Amino acid sequence: MAFTKCWLAYPEIRGCHCDAISLHTELTGETIDRAKAELAEGFKGLYGAALTEGDDITLALDMALDPEGYRLKAADGHCTIEGGSEVGVLYGVFALLRNLQTAGKAWAQFTADEEKASSNRLRMLNHWDNMDGSIERGYSGDSFFFKDSEILIDVPRLTAYARMLASVGINGITINNVNVKDAASWLITDRYFGALQEYLKIFTPYGVKLYLSINFAAPMELGGMDSADPCDPAVAKWWADKAQEVWANLPGLGGFLVKADSEGRPGPFTYGRNQADGANMLADAVAPCGGHIVWRCFVYNCQQDWRNTKIDRARAGYDYFMPLDGTFRDNVTLQIKNGPMDFQVREPVSPLIGGLQHT
């Protein structure tokens, strides 16, 4: 299937041709390799220039910068890009190429003095792709991650997608629908580890962490247990063991995205527990692996009678989560939908977004 490069096509800046632009760096590694490749492609497209060895551009680290931040300085045909990490350097490279295009100037005339730091540590996209290849609420074709319960490995397209994400600072992605069912429940098993390892090889060098949406009832559906009660020590052990297995096979995985107690799916409420009980149990399981739990707040009773005007479904998430503010583990992020209900013609911002102060 054909695909576009979006804003990374690097069209020629007319009248600004130059034969070569040189680069020097002592940095090594896969992310730096991606940065060099981006510069080479960008300069070839914008100026028709080859990327050679020299000191026109210097890539370096400055650990005083934000870990994902960068500093870009350019004048008189020379440019320095410093990052707080290799990913910061990559972000600086994308910033240079972006600024060159908006300036529309010859390389020797280009000037820049820019320093950026991340204001949000997690900048994630959630795909609602199903493993049969369909996309829930999808609007532009089928999934390029899944088909017929298998993981697709389209390296050129996935690489182009990872580039696009990195170019705008996206650093996390879940590839499967948060409504986890059927084959998707098995993504955390050896049935799919091999293919997911290929995804890690593609996304990780671009600073994009791979996350998986999981089934809260996995101890029952995968492990044959009678319960998924988050306060049951046997359930907690099952998840701790599963986390060790997953990260042993998928080192560098970002973590899990969880939708529980919503639209008929089981969760902590099924067992008389609260949302922090569920999120914290999983957080403790993945913490030794450096994992992160993203816990959705779109929780309500889907069997409520919409004709009962005394029931205010829109406040359900607020009522459930506000009393728990400050009780979640540090490796838990609560994911709040912009509005408290689906499919509204106009939608107020969820009061949870401004209400939670310690989570």
PLM segments and residue spans:
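Charged, often glycine-rich, active-site loop that binds/positions anionic groups
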Residues: 61-69, 308-315
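Catalytic-core regions of glycoside hydrolase
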Residues: 151, 227-359
